[in-house]
Amino acid sequence: MKQSHFFAHLSRLKLINRWPLMRNVRTENVSEHSLQVAMVAHALAAIKNRKFGGNVNAERIALLAMYHDASEVLTGDLPTPVKYFNSQIAQEYKAIEKIAQQKLVDMVPEELRDIFAPLIDEHAYSDEEKSLVKQADALCAYLKCLEELAAGNNEFLLAKTRLEATLEARRSQEMDYFMEVFVPSFHLSLDEISQDSPL
């Protein structure tokens, strides 16, 4: 059997730090970000289905979110201001991401490729799937800003404002529900969120 470096590469996502140009109270890596995005995307899909008549596969959405930044193990995490400095850079970076995604897919053993390719190649996402993952991605970045600001790090003030505009642009009923039900707790301390459920 031929060896594959696929999971050895993915395990290195934990070595890639997000928000590299900003001072962080707590450094966040791509691996932990991907897990949080997967959990939030799954929640958004479940909320959409249960509350707003949606019909999406919440488990698939979670998997797509888990792999949504996988190509960064080959490209690194390009800071947002650089990535979107102008449309030409954004377009070129998309092309680089596509190449990196294909390179990852090519690492998967051929007999498993049809399982992993649709998770890694974002062109295999439906518009609805892409929208839910993007909403979750933006929500998690926003939550990171809240955490940094709560720790007294005003470096994230402008990022929070920018992300509020992004969330407004991607707004949906399921996002509104998530923001109303789950996000307020991120403003509280551990003691405050533990009050109602003592161990």
Curated annotation (Swiss-Prot):
Keywords in alphabetical order, please: Cytoplasm, Hydrolase, Metal-binding, Nucleotide-binding
Q: Reply yes or no: does the keyword Transmembrane helix apply.
A: no
Top-rank lineage group of the source organism: Bacteria
Q: What is its EC number?
A: 3.1.3.89
Pfam families attached to this UniProt entry: YfbR-like
Q: Which residues bind a divalent metal cation?
A: H33, H68, D69, D137
- Swiss-Prot/TrEMBL catalytic activity: a 2'-deoxyribonucleoside 5'-phosphate + H2O = a 2'-deoxyribonucleoside + phosphate
The protein's GO terms of the molecular function aspect are: 5'-deoxynucleotidase activity; metal ion binding; nucleotide binding
Subcellular location(s) of the protein? Cytoplasm
Entry's SMART domains?
Answer: HDc
List, alphabetically, the GO terms of the cellular component aspect: cytoplasm
| Every HD domain range | 30-142
- Reported cofactor(s): a divalent metal cation
Q: What class of enzyme is it?
A: hydrolase
Q: Where is this site: Appears to be important in orienting the phosphate for catalysis?
A: R18
InterPro entries documented for this protein: HD/PDEase_dom, HD_domain, YfbR, YfbR/HDDC2
**UniProt: substrate binding residues:** R18, W19, H33, D69, D77, L78, P79, T80, D137
- Assign the protein's first listed, main location to one coarse class: cytoplasm
Q: What does this protein do?
A: Catalyzes the strictly specific dephosphorylation of 2'-deoxyribonucleoside 5'-monophosphates.
Family designation: Belongs to the 5DNU family.
> Oligomeric state and partners?
Homodimer.
Q: Under which name does UniProt file this protein? A: 5'-deoxynucleotidase YfbR
